[in-house]
Amino acid sequence: SIFEYNGSAVVAMVGKNCFAIASDRRLGVQLQTIATDFQRISKIHDRVFIGLSGLATDVQTLYQRLVFRHKLYQLREERDMKPETFASLVSAILYEKRFGPYLCQPVIAGLGDDDKPFICTMDSIGAKELAKDFVVSGTASESLYGACEAMYKPDMEAEELFETISQALLSSVDRDCLSGWGGHVYIVTPTEIKERILKGRMD
Amino acid sequence: MSRRYDSRTTIFSPEGRLYQVEYAMEAIGNAGSAIGILSKDGVVLIGEKKVTSKLLQTSTSAEKMYKIDDHVACAVAGIMSDANILINTARVQAQRYTFMYQEPMPVEQLVQSLCDTKQGYTQFGGLRPFGVSFLFAGWDKHHGFQLYMSDPSGNYGGWKAAAVGANNQAAQSILKQDYKDDATREEAVELALKVLTKTMDSTSLTSEKLELAEVYLTPSKTVKYHVHSPESLTKLLVKHGVTQPAAETS
């Protein structure tokens, strides 16, 4: 499958008035590793992040298109997009290419106006799937489901959430040949954004 | 028979003039004025808002100052509905450039693309030209801080200090006298306010009638576009002594 060409693992979790989004750092071409510092998670603005799993070239192009559309929204409305609005935008852009889709599965995480966290994922043609606890995508998604299912607790504070998402990510990518080589974690609270780079099994 | 060369924009008069374009410029001469001044550490834009009625709900956002991209802003004089169309195309152009080349659009290129649009309306189809003059303030890595002025014909030029709208000739000549090449941004603001007091119809400046915006570099070398709030504008007006203490109104 073309979704498994480069390998990826993306996960987002909700905490108490905060959220975390994390991804692996590997860029491969099937079983050969090309880079170990690939960015799959991008900041849209201070309160909304998007992680894109799937084909790396489409990940970058889709992100650039989203920046384009978000920037025009910012200029016209003189405010940032709400996470729910942004998710609908991503969904609409993906569905535009219904019969020749961007080969990525997005994970969107953000904080709303009342500091309420929002997470969602969708398939490559924009069918939204909302969740209250965690969302996963990428080649490691099956093992991520298991790890998150076992480790997740509701209403975690930022530090505990970081620990949980990191452990879930690292243990999952060890069970997947195509993702791994450390991790990239963002913890977003109403007041600050923490960005951390994880070392895992670097092989 | 002067109507003969008026009705279509695409026709030259025997004297070699395009009347519709000249009428468009005339329309701008009645609009609230805007002044732009280049200084060594930034660009200052100031605009006069025409208060048509006190019953009119004033909009919360700036009326004459528009951000085009993170590094470019513009001030408008003329027909606002025409301006909105052009501002929208300018914003889309800037984002298209960024999407294509992953870097901010050079300021002059942006001004040029907008002026190409304006020019098109003076030549093709039985349409009227845009009744808008712009002042563009921006920064790019090629030429640093820049100030451009454009008119309905699609002409543009880079300026150290420029004025558009009502009384622009008077403003221009004061600017010519008092502009200093090594002025700081603060001095540029002072000069802009001074010019506006002299060219505006009303005697005293108040924050309701003005809009002030600046484009400058932050210490971390990112471009910042800042529109002053009415409060900070009032402070500036008092500081530079261009406002009279509030007159009693019955």
UniProtKB/Swiss-Prot annotation, chain B:
Chain's role: The proteasome is a multicatalytic proteinase complex which is characterized by its ability to cleave peptides with Arg, Phe, Tyr, Leu, and Glu adjacent to the leaving group at neutral or slightly basic pH. The proteasome has an ATP-dependent proteolytic activity.
Tissue expression pattern: Ubiquitous low levels, higher expression in siliques and flowers.
InterPro entries associated with the record: Ntn_hydrolases_N (IPR029055), Proteasome_alpha (IPR050115), Proteasome_alpha-type (IPR023332), Proteasome_asu_N (IPR000426), Proteasome_sua/b (IPR001353)
UniProt keyword Plastid present: no
Subcellular location: Cytoplasm; Nucleus
Record bears the keyword Nucleus: yes
GO CC annotations on file: cytosol; cytosolic ribosome; mitochondrion; nucleus; proteasome complex; proteasome core complex, alpha-subunit complex; vacuole
Cross-link (Glycyl lysine isopeptide (Lys-Gly) (interchain with G-Cter in ubiquitin)), chain numbering: 40, 64
Biological process, per Gene Ontology: ubiquitin-dependent protein catabolic process
Pfam family, one: Proteasome_A_N
Subunit composition and interactions: Component of the 20S core complex of the 26S proteasome. The 26S proteasome is composed of a core protease (CP), known as the 20S proteasome, capped at one or both ends by the 19S regulatory particle (RP/PA700). The 20S proteasome core is composed of 28 subunits that are arranged in four stacked rings, resulting in a barrel-shaped structure. The two end rings are each formed by seven alpha subunits, and the two central rings are each formed by seven beta subunits. The catalytic chamber with the active sites is on the inside of the barrel.
Lineage: Eukaryota, Viridiplantae, Streptophyta, Embryophyta, Tracheophyta
Protein name per its UniProtKB record: Proteasome subunit alpha type-4-A
Gene of this entry: PAC1
Family per similarity comment: Belongs to the peptidase T1A family.
Chief location: cytoplasm
Gene3D superfamilies: Glutamine Phosphoribosylpyrophosphate, subunit 1, domain 1
Keywords: Cytoplasm, Isopeptide bond, Nucleus, Proteasome, Ubl conjugation
Top-level lineage group: Eukaryota
